[in-house]
Amino acid sequence: GATNEGKRQDPAMQKFRDNRLGAFIHWGLYAIPGGEWNGKMYGGAAEWLKSWAKVPADEWLKLMDQWNPTKFDAKKWARMAKEMGAKYVKITTKHHEGFCLWPSKYTQYTVANTPYKKDLLGEMVKAYNDEGIDVHFYFSVMDWSHPDYRYSIKSEEDSIAFSRFLEFTDNQLKELATRYPTVKDFWFD
């Protein structure tokens, strides 16, 4: 568990300690509205806006039509990280809203179905690898966009639905590990 992390002496943990400085890229559809929805500011983290503002799923999905980061430059980001001394980067593959920065074949809620269309995650993995920076993935085990996700299991129907969600999650994780084999680890939230 987390209480034993400080005692680990294995090579992977030692490398993580030796890396010392890293970057964390927290990016998703929530970056478009930031912390504001319908003229109201919500304090705290923008990635929770959909939940805090109780935004209906169909309304949130409309943000995909605006997702077009044409000025995004993965190589520039990776160069800046290297210049600041980062030895690793943690990239959000998807946050709780379920929007995938890679073209997942298991959901339509993905960058492939936006005006940008490109595999942002793939661009970042390549750019950071090219700079000699280890890439780690953040992956939300919550997914507000998936119909079978459950906060709690209250019935047999919930249990069956959540089993389908677990299969979906397993498929996405296998997909990420296969598409991006140089990734060093996953951080589950």
Model-flagged regions — what are they?
Residues 1-189:
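Mature catalytic domains of secreted/periplasmic carbohydrate-active enzymes
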